[in-house]
Amino acid sequence: LMPEHLTVYELRTNMLSRYPIATAEQRFEQYSYLYDLITGLGYKGRFGMNTFSLTGDYGLSSYLQHRMMENGSYKGLGIAAQSKNDTGISYNIGKYGESLECCLYMNTFEEGGDSYRLPPRELLSKYVAISGYCGMMDLSGMEEILHSDPNMVFEKELGFLLNNDYIEKDGTMLYLTPKGFLHYGAVLSLFYN
């Protein structure tokens, strides 16, 4: 099989108790091995991305690319699904374990759901977390969320990350370097509120 796109995931948090937890260095070695294997098969993707493509795009569907790279709004469908727009996030009913029958009886997935209006910095945190899957962030998308220049808002953080080779900057794009990917949790958290 040679699918058009490949995605590499770490174990989800609900699976962590079933398997031994690898160190950051072990996960980095595992990713490096997979990266070399996947790119050796002809797939394209920057080091630090978890999506790869034979066609040389981001390896994402247009929906995911809009959501992850362009800070697009999205509507989650289904019980406990998350939705996001330019003012906040919301969760459909069912996240606290209501039965499917109970949820269907309500005739909507919005009634009884949780909605949160978020300040720009918290919305930015969501964008950073989502775009981190691709190992890159767009400063123009960040500016749209913050309503101010992220180069000024995060001047110290960007200076530190660039000067220490954790990220690279190309136009409005920020890319994790291999060194930054090794510490991606710490790198991304510098942009959280």
Positions of the model-derived regions?
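C-terminal scaffold of the Radical SAM
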Residues: 1-148
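Short, Lys/Arg-rich nucleic-acid/phosphate-binding segment
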Residues: 50-52, 171-174
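Basic, amphipathic "hinge/linker" alpha-helix immediately C-terminal to the N-terminal HTH DNA-binding motif
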Residues: 120, 174-181
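Short amphipathic alpha-helical interaction segments
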Residues: 148-162
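A short, conserved structural fragment
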Residues: 162-172
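Short, amphipathic alpha-helical interaction segments positioned at domain boundaries
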Residues: 181-193
